[in-house]
């Protein structure tokens, strides 16, 4: 009920043309701008979470492939080979999804790059370089233990970078929430203190 009354009074003030009307519209425009920024940040967070989830799944399969490869190096035989290939096939199936998720994340981050440092942008470019390396390089020699280990380390670094960026995006979102709350409070006080 309070919110509805406040909205009605806000509209009355804006239509009356008193000095507070201009101030109210400026604050409302600032709030709308912040809400748009928050929307862009949330889209980037969602996209980053998707990429992070795929990276974690790839890491699980690479860890398993690494273990089977170690067992194979110690004479594990046909069962170790089959298990290793199975895990590497699962990784290969996920790589294209991961590459697409990284591209999507990069696209979403482009909408908020003016708020993110230049160094971070370079790291985002490295994501795609990593994905291209992984997609092109791993499976030409995928029985080699070192390739599995190297790919695992690259996936882990990329996952860590995604997590770091997600932390920065969450910090930005929290900062925008505080600014928006302050503006909403300013708007409310302007309306309540108006004589209209």
Question: Where would I find each of the regions flagged by the language model?
Answer:
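Long, non-membrane, amphipathic alpha-helices that form coiled-coils
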Residues: 1-62, 148-196
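Long amphipathic all-alpha helical oligomerization modules
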Residues: 64-94, 107-196
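Domain-scale macromolecular recognition modules
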Residues: 25-111
